[in-house]
Amino acid sequence: MDKRIAIVGAGWAGCAAAVEGVSAGCHVTLFEASHISGGRARKTFVEGMAVDNGQHILLGAYRQTLRLMRQVGIDTRQAFLNLPLQMRYPPFPAVMDFVTPRWPAPFHLVAGLLKAKGLNREDRLALARFFACCRAIRWDIGEDRPVIRLLEQFRQTPKLYALLWRPLCLAALNTSPEQASASVFLAVLRDSLGRKRTDSDMLVPVTDLSALFPEKALAYCIARKGVVRLGETVRHIAFDEKGWVID
């Protein structure tokens, strides 16, 4: 395939697009204003120490992400700590301890809910109502709205919001419930909680986020004659008789 493709931004989406492009035989040029790839999920340096720029987890349902990681040479079995779905807090004071067993879906969720510590009857009923309603509507709410509105609609308790929904939304979407898309959030829940048990497994990175995928993705592209331009800002995109021009 003799196509020239320019990709603006070397976040995870840009890196994924570049990998797919060079794999299809395209001539790919990837532009990134920063000197480090990864976008909102990358390493940064604080006082000379490399740290992640945010807390991120993956879920077992992220099949295409995991496929791309393996494609660029990452051993996904070694790159993550694989945990069953859980939300655990320090036992003192006893706030909440929710852990699902490695049982077939949806029994793992039922068992986790029944055994959860720190949840009262109102919390359990609210959580059960949420999942029952989502399954009934096939995880489709129609017109989109912020996640916070969805939680209010399904009458989730303040404790569930603070200890379950808000942390889960931030971890999965890197966006607060006040701003995150409820449709996207439900799609994540559908893919992770509405299917196989392994889809809900929490994959906690054991390396920095840049090494987890972006750096390997860039090396993969360069090895296939792709061009990576870090530290270059695209300021102008125009179309003329010869095609698209990027400056």
Spans of model-derived segments:
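Helical element adjacent to the flavin cofactor pocket in flavoenzyme catalytic cores
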Residues: 186-244
